[in-house]
Amino acid sequence: MSAVRSKICGITRIEDALAAAEAGADAIGLVFYPKSPRAVTVLQARAIIAALPPFITTVGLFVNASRCELNETLDAVALDMLQFHGDETPDECDGYHRPYIKALRVKAGDDIAQVCRTYRNARGVLLDTYVEGVPGGTGETFDWALIPDDLDKPVILAGGLTSANVAQAIAQVRPYAVDVSGGVEKSKGIKDREKILAFMSAVHGT
């Protein structure tokens, strides 16, 4: 099995982005959802991206944003990839000249495989915990046994991951990548360098 990739999401500070890069993260997530405590402004995002070393993918997270809002952000911020974390339809995810991943909030009874096929142009699916009224960042895990073995897209596993459970998650789910936010924080939006290092060490098995 190839190495599992990783994204540290909800970055709001330059020092946290650099800590993620130094620890070996492949990507950082920048939240453009004003209701989130981890939201960043265009100016914050530009400063964070400008400080990054090479080969760190920048992912912009959006929740039910209008096409106008998204295009304005993309005109101002050099994002490599988009993450749609709301109720966006496949058509609403297309047309931005950026690769995208679609977040799915998992609950019992969902036909995850069918939903994945619906988002035919998605580069991958991010599987997160379903909590009613909360689009993401719940800090809670879900039953990984609900994930089908035959998904036709790379799986990015999210939802309540920490340094204490990510190795087990990787062994059980065998995802393409893992995504963490709250599991490496001091408080919402403020990352903890030691927690980032511990998480990445667990991901890499070192």
Curated annotation (Swiss-Prot):
Keywords for this protein: Amino-acid biosynthesis, Aromatic amino acid biosynthesis, Isomerase, Tryptophan biosynthesis
GO BP field: L-tryptophan biosynthetic process
UniProt catalytic activity: N-(5-phospho-beta-D-ribosyl)anthranilate = 1-(2-carboxyphenylamino)-1-deoxy-D-ribulose 5-phosphate
InterPro entries: Aldolase_TIM (IPR013785), PRAI_dom (IPR001240), RibuloseP-bd_barrel (IPR011060), TrpF_fam (IPR044643)
Highest taxon, organism lineage: Bacteria
Gene Ontology molecular function terms on file: phosphoribosylanthranilate isomerase activity
Pathway annotation from the record: Amino-acid biosynthesis; L-tryptophan biosynthesis; L-tryptophan from chorismate: step 3/5
UniProt KW Nucleus keyword: no
EC annotation from Swiss-Prot or TrEMBL: 5.3.1.24
Gene3D superfamilies for this protein: Aldolase class I
Database matches in HAMAP family: PRAI (MF_00135)
Assigned protein family: Belongs to the TrpF family.
NCBIfam families: PRK01222.1-4 (NF002298), PRK01222.1-6 (NF002299)
Protein name (record): N-(5'-phosphoribosyl)anthranilate isomerase
Organism field: Pseudomonas savastanoi pv. phaseolicola (strain 1448A / Race 6)
Lineage start: Bacteria, Pseudomonadati, Pseudomonadota, Gammaproteobacteria, Pseudomonadales
Gene expressing this chain: trpF
